[in-house]
Amino acid sequence: MNRIVAPAAASVVVGLLLGAAAIFGVTLMVQQDKKPPLPGGDPSSSVLNRVEYGNRS
């Protein structure tokens, strides 16, 4: 009976470790699948939505 119990226990341990690693990996992938927040521009210090072509005189 011990010839069956030891490999079965080892198989269960390896399966649990692989399952935990897979869950951890998927969790990391899902967390990193987001766009980073874009910093808002300061309207008083930039020329947002205004095209400046230079002096045309």
UniProtKB/Swiss-Prot annotation:
<feature type="signal peptide">
    <location>
        <begin position="1"/>
        <end position="32"/>
    </location>
</feature>
<protein>
    <recommendedName>
        <fullName>Putative secreted protein Mb0242c</fullName>
    </recommendedName>
</protein>
<dbReference type="InterPro" id="IPR022566">
    <property type="entry name" value="DUF2613"/>
</dbReference>
<keyword id="KW-0732">Signal</keyword>
<dbReference type="Pfam" id="PF11021">
    <property type="entry name" value="DUF2613"/>
</dbReference>
<feature type="region of interest" description="Disordered">
    <location>
        <begin position="34"/>
        <end position="57"/>
    </location>
</feature>
